[in-house]
Structures are given as C-alpha cells and as structure tokens.
Design a protein with these regions (language model features):
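Mixed-charge interfacial surface used for oligomerization/domain docking
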Residues: 3-5, 11-25, 30-32, 41, ...
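Class I S-adenosyl-L-methionine
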Residues: 36-86, 90-106
C-alpha cells in the first residue's frame, strides 16, 4: 500500500488540533510586518491588528520559506513515505503551490501538487475529501482526480467594510477610497474559476451588500445544492458584521448549517479587519 503524506499551507486555516487529528503537515505563509518576519501560525489576528491599525506598521505576505519546503520533503522521504499530496492555496493568491512543486523536485521526492483554486475552508474541505478517499483505499491518481473535480465546486464572496487597508497596500487609490466612503460603497469580491480575486458587485450599504451575497447563495443553492448543507461565514475582527450576516442567512435559508470562522492573518493583511465572507462547496 502506498504511504502518502499530506501537506497544506496555513491559508487553509486549520487549527493545530484539527491538523494533528487528520495527520496533515502545515507549511506556514510568512508575514512581513515593518520589516520583521513572522510565521502565520505564530501571529494572531489581534497581534496583527495591533501592528497594522494601532501602530500603523506596514505589513505584507510572503510565500513559505523555500528551504523549509525542501527540508520537509527530505524528511518525509527519510521517513519512508512514497509520495505526498500537497493541497495549496490558489496560485492567484500566492506562489506557494509553485514553490512546493519546485521544492519537491529539489528534494527528489514525488509530490502531487494541487492548486485548490481557493483558500480557507474550501482548501480544508479538499484535504478532508482526499483523506477520506485515502481511507477508502483509493489510489493516489484517483485521489488527485477527485480533488481536481471538487476544487471547481467552491463559492466564495467577501465584503470589504473599510478600504483603508487596501489603499495602504496599493490595491485602491486614495480617490477611490474617498469616493467609496462618501457614497457608502461596500465592494464585494469573489474568486474566479482559477482562484484569482475579482470584483463581484458594489453595494451602497452593508445591508445591501449582505442581501447581494445571500441572494447569490440562494440562487446557487437552488441550482447546485450545498455540500453537507453547510456554509462557512468568516470575519477578521468584526463580530457584529458576522452576527448580522449570519442572521440574514438563517432567516432566508433555515435549512443550512452556518459555521462561524475567522479569516487567517494573511487574508487580513490584504483585506483588512472590517470584513465578512461566506464560502461553501456545491453539492
């Protein structure tokens, strides 16, 4: 029987306990704050907020350290693993998957690299689906094909409540932010089929933005269903936004289970802290 190792990165947002239970090795995304490097798994949202908002420090993300990747794959080879399946965040968000593949080649270790076309719970779900398939005795090739099919079932939408972080990161201009603030515009973003961030809609208030996202959830639920009847609602540090959005989902779609989660720090670096998102897989 093939001995398979499982790898993912910290943008999957696994808790340490869940990763340990599943037997998944987490490679951390790096955060650079005011020139100092931090492993994403060792920096909380609260600490990041203090640095970025209270202390006005600049922050950005960086892919996992290449040498760490090589070291992990060399260790797995020494431990007798035949191969690894590495489920990584979208190439549209980070170069992690490309570096993972390059590190595997450098370590001369067979790794099946999966670009999840997503992050967060969509990335998590792929790992869980793959682990379940492994337990059923499916071959590596069958597992990889299964994951490549499931990754196209992801749905993700996020409201940007405050554009200041995006302005500081150069993603919007000061003029665009000023106009959005004056008109109370709340941008909604989504991921395209390859996992690249693209605009979805602009709403003229938070209430209208919530309605847009729930309306999209209703339409897609009617067309494609929702895996396990479960949706994930994320925030960074805006519990009131999360509460209001969850209440609307539960009023419109009472048959769905809503799981509240938090964005990982690498998402907050780019999108800010006044955010709420919803994610699910088609059935």
């Amino acid at each position: 029987m093939t001995k398979i190792a499982w790898i993912t990165d910290s943008m999957a947002n696994f808790s340490q306990e869940e990763a340990a239970r599943l037997g998944v090795d987490i490679v951390p995304i790096q955060l650079i704050v005011d020139g100092n490097g931090y492993s994403e798994t060792n920096l909380s949202l609260e600490d990041l907020h203090r640095y970025m908002i209270d202390q006005k420090k600049e922050a950005k993300t960086s892919q996992p350290i290449f040498g760490d990747f090589i070291g992990r794959y060399e260790r797995l080879k020494e431990e007798g693993y035949d191969c690894a399946i590495a489920v990584h965040c979208s190439n549209g968000l980070s170069s992690t998957a490309k570096n993972s593949k390059a590190a595997a080649e450098a370590a001369d270790f067979k790794v099946y690299t999966i670009d999840s076309h997503a992050a967060l719970e969509a990335q998590q779900e792929l790992v869980r689906i793959g682990k379940a398939a492994e337990e059923e005795g499916k071959s590596v090739e069958e597992i990889v094909a299964l994951l490549e099919a499931w990754r196209d079932k992801k749905n993700f939408f996020m409201i940007i409540g405050n554009m200041e972080t995006m302005r500081r990161g150069g993603r919007v201009s000061s003029g665009e932010m000023f106009l959005a603030n004056i008109l109370n515009i709340k941008p909604i973003i989504t991921l395209d089929e390859t996992g690249k961030v693209i605009p979805f809609k602009k709403a003229r208030s938070l209430k209208k933005a919530y309605a847009e996202m729930v309306g999209e959830l209703e339409r897609r639920h009617a067309d494609n269903g929702v895996k396990d009847n479960r949706v994930f609602v994320q925030t960074a540090l805006s519990p009131k936004m999360q509460d209001d959005f969850v209440a609307l989902i539960e009023s419109k779609l009472p048959g769905l289970e809503v799981v509240r989660t938090r964005f990982c720090p690498s998402i907050a670096v780019h999108a800010g802290f006044e955010t709420v998102g919803v994610l699910w897989l088609d059935a």
